[in-house]
Amino acid sequence: MKSLQALFGGTFDPVHYGHLKPVETLANLIGLSRVIIMPNNVPPHRPQPEASSAQRKYMLELAIADKPLFILDERELKRDTASYTAQTLKEWREEQGPDAPLAFIIGQDSLLTFPTWHDYETILDNTHLIVCRRPGYPLEMVKEQHQQWLERHLTHTPDDLHALPAGKIYLAETPWFNISATLIRERLEKGEPCDDLMPESVLNYINQQGLYR
């Protein structure tokens, strides 16, 4: 049996401990063999990143240089068109084969808006969903039909994530770090310290490049 892998996507503008530490804890809790970090290029539903694709990629390389759990995947950065999760996960499934257990990591806030994502119905055909719980967010979907969808796929044991290739939703108890890329950009713009929010190597690069000023 192949070991469970997970994909973790985002803008990472910039990458920080709020991205890395919960996922490291998650990997230990449920037994992830590796986590593929995938920065996106043109998020269809979000403002454009302040740092360039090359700069965001390099900051990620610095952040995970001493973390063998993580592997960087550049495929979305190389696209000239908008990045859609459903398309990426379909490609990943085709590469890994039909039987490999695969998961996609999202935050609880993203779960609540998940039914608005492009082709969201197809995502569980290709992967599991691992949801990192966040304080202040409800555990129920807005619409009853979406709540029924959640309950139909919900599992309370990570064993299912290893035993099945796709199709389950697992709510994980991960630590919450009150850090956001927006907060970091605001602090950097004001000249406030960010030493405790991100790896030193990333902060040094930001300062060298004069980013987020």
Swiss-Prot record:
A GO BP entry: NAD biosynthetic process
Protein origin, superkingdom: Bacteria
Reactions catalysed according to its record: nicotinate beta-D-ribonucleotide + ATP + H(+) = deamido-NAD(+) + diphosphate
Entry keyword set: ATP-binding, NAD, Nucleotide-binding, Nucleotidyltransferase, Pyridine nucleotide biosynthesis, Transferase
A Gene Ontology molecular function term of the record: nicotinate-nucleotide adenylyltransferase activity
Pfam families noted in UniProt: CTP_transf_like (PF01467)
UniProt xrefs under InterPro entries: Cyt_trans-like, NadD/NMNAT, Rossmann-like_a/b/a_fold
Class of the enzyme per the UniProt entry, highest EC level: transferase
Role, per record: Catalyzes the reversible adenylation of nicotinate mononucleotide (NaMN) to nicotinic acid adenine dinucleotide (NaAD).
Family (UniProt): Belongs to the NadD family.
PANTHER family associated with the record: NICOTINATE-NUCLEOTIDE ADENYLYLTRANSFERASE-RELATED, PHOSPHOPANTETHEINE ADENYLYLTRANSFERASE
Name of the protein this chain belongs to: Probable nicotinate-nucleotide adenylyltransferase
Organism: Citrobacter koseri (strain ATCC BAA-895 / CDC 4225-83 / SGSC4696)
Gene of this entry: nadD
